[in-house]
Structures are given as C-alpha cells and as structure tokens.
C-alpha cells in the first residue's frame, strides 16, 4: 500500500466514560461525561466515501473520543470502513470495553488487524478501585495475540508515583509489554505550558527514566523546547478531524477549518499553520513522530517500538508509518515550502 502521506487526529462523539480519573483533561475543562449521548451527523458509508485515498492520500488516522472511545460499537464499524478505504488506524481506548474489542477481533480481517494499532491507556488506580485490572490486561494481551499493534500508555500522574515499579512489572508479566509514559497536562488553562504535577520538573522527568520510554523522552523534549516558533505543516500534512460532524481544524490549538464532509466531490481545502502556531507547546508528540516540522531529529515510529517493545507492532505498520511527512513533502515539492 505504501507509506502514509498524512496524519489525522480523529475525534468521535463518544461523550461518555466508564472511568472517573482525577487527571482527566475533560474533567479539568469541566466537560461533564455522565449524561451525554453519542451522536453522529453522517453515516459510515458516506464517511467512507468522504475519506477516499483520492481526496486524502493514504492516512494514519488516530481515533479518540471525548470519553471512552470504544464505548460505542459505531467506532469499530467506522475504523473498519476507514481500513477498507485504504488507511491505517489507531484507536485510543481504556481497554475495558471487552465486548467491543471482541467484536473488533471477529469483524476485522487479518490484513486489517495488521493495519490497526490499539493505544491502551492504563488508568491504574481507577481500575484497581473498580477491580478491573485483570480484565484490562487480559484484553491487551488478547488483542496483541490477535495480530493488532498494541501500545500501553500511562499518563504520569502524581497518584501513580508510589506504584511505578508495580505498574511496570504488572504490564510485563500479564501483557508482555513495557508501557510508554506521557506527560500529564494541566488542561484547566490551555494557554499555558504546564504539567499537572506537584513535583519539580527535574524530579518528574527523573521518575520516568526506568521505563526507557521514547515517547516520554520526545514529550520531554517538546516541553523543554516547545517548537511552536518553527514552521509547521499541520493543517496540510496533519489535521484534526471530527468524524461525528465532518469539521476539520489545523490541529488541537489552531482553529482555522471547515466541514470537509459537506462537498465530498471537491478537494479537501488544506491550510497549513506555517509560522502562525497558537499553542503554548506542541503537546501531541505524534505530530512530530510523523515529522510535521521539517529538518528535526525527533524519533521515528520505529524508534517508539524499538528494543523490548519491538514485538508489539507489525512490519506492515513500521513500513507504512516510518516516515517524516514534511521532509518528504519538501523534497518532492521544493517550490511549495514555507509559502
């Protein structure tokens, strides 16, 4: 199928969650999840046509809900349709929707599973409180054994600090996976560059070292050197797209956009951020794993899954995702850079 040509940060309207985590960014933004319903403006067959490779190129589409992504079976059907359209998929989920994970295993072909990554967020203390740790770890292991690329992600919240060794050992013993870490963001004010921790940043970064997490190391680099003053191809080679409404924006913090599902006979009107980033720091490391700022030495996708994590991904995913989109674009279109 070839390498990806675009990264899509995809939103879906799964506006409910079965967990209640203290550091949840939606909770910090006072976004209530209890009574909300899951609503989708377009049906899946229409979305599949709207997301054709002819319009978008081959994409890596990361799906995430405002709540638990897989709480709605619709997301599994959407992911399969996007795979049928020729794309690669990631689904960020909390690993507890056992029936919908089973439905995914039963409805995806082997080839589709090989083009699907499952990012399992691990909410240790909340899962322990609800007595669902075993269910979570069993689901992760089962999906890995079924041919999916799997990834355990732990947001390094202060409440986990006393349990870090236990968490790491549990993931290795029960799921055969060394987890990755991410910085916990203070989302109560998205205009500021702040981590949600009472620790000094020096000690906070030190706590992550035993995990040898390339993802955390990239997050740290982006925190210390926000890179928002550099020329960025978000809005063109990477976008934020709400699959429930069809509305596309440049990225999480840059709001230029439009509905790209209204007139699917027309080209997608991409508009890159360029020098005009409005974010306090680039807190979505995936944008830089796929290289939306040219000329940087940030890690590749294969670096994230190197060493003891190598067995968690397929060669198909490595071949497709091991690229720097902006560097490739600049080489192919030298006349269009920094327009």
Language-model segments: what does each one mean?
Residues 50-55, 79-84, 104-115, 137-145, ...:
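Acidic (Asp/Glu)-rich catalytic clusters
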Residues 190-323, 327-330, 334, 338:
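Accessory C-terminal segments flanking Radical SAM cores
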Residues 46-66, 311-328:
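Short Fe-S-cluster ligation motifs
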Residues 38-50, 76-77, 101-104, 130-140, ...:
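Well-ordered, non-membrane alpha-helical segments in soluble/globular domains
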Residues 123-244:
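Radical SAM enzyme [4Fe-4S]-AdoMet core and its adjacent flexible, acidic
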Residues 1-42, 252:
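Canonical Radical SAM [4Fe-4S] cluster-binding loop centered on the CxxxCxxC motif
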Residues 36-46, 295-302:
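Short cysteine/histidine-rich metal-coordination sites, predominantly Zn2+-binding motifs
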Residues 7-8, 28-41, 57-72, 83-100, ...:
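Core AdoMet radical
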């Amino acid at each position: 199928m070839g390498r990806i040509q675009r990264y899509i940060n995809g939103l879906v309207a799964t506006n409910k969650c079965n967990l209640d985590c203290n550091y949840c960014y939606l909770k910090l933004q006072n976004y209530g999840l209890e009574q909300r319903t899951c609503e989708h403006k377009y049906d899946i067959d229409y979305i599949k046509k709207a997301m054709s490779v002819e319009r978008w190129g081959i994409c890596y589409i990361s799906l995430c809900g405002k709540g638990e992504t897989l709480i709605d079976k619709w997301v599994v059907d959407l992911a399969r349709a996007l795979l049928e359209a020729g794309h690669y998929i990631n689904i960020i989920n909390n690993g507890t929707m056992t029936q919908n994970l089973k439905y995914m295993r039963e409805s995806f072909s082997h080839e589709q599973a090989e083009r699907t990554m499952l990012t399992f967020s691990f909410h240790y203390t909340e899962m322990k409180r609800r007595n669902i740790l075993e269910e979570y770890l069993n689901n992760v292991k089962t999906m890995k054994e079924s041919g999916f690329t799997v990834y355990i992600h732990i947001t390094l919240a202060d409440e986990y600090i006393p349990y870090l060794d236990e968490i790491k050992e549990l993931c290795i013993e029960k799921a055969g996976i060394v987890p990755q870490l991410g910085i916990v963001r203070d989302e109560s004010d998205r205009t500021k560059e702040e981590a949600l921790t009472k620790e000094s940043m020096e000690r906070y970064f030190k706590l992550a070292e035993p995990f040898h997490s390339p993802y955390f190391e990239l997050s740290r680099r982006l925190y210390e050197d926000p890179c928002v003053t550099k020329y960025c191809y978000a809005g063109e080679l990477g976008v934020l797209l709400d699959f429930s409404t069809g509305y596309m924006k440049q990225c999480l913090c840059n709001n230029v956009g439009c509905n790209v599902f209204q007139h699917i006979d027309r080209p997608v009107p991409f508009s890159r951020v360029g020098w005009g980033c409005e974010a306090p720091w680039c807190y979505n490391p995936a944008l830089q794993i796929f290289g939306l700022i040219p000329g940087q030495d940030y890690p590749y996708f294969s670096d994230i899954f190197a060493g003891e994590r190598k067995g968690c991904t397929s060669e198909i995913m490595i071949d497709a995702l091991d690229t720097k989109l902006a560097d490739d674009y600049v080489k192919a279109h030298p006349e269009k850079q920094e327009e």
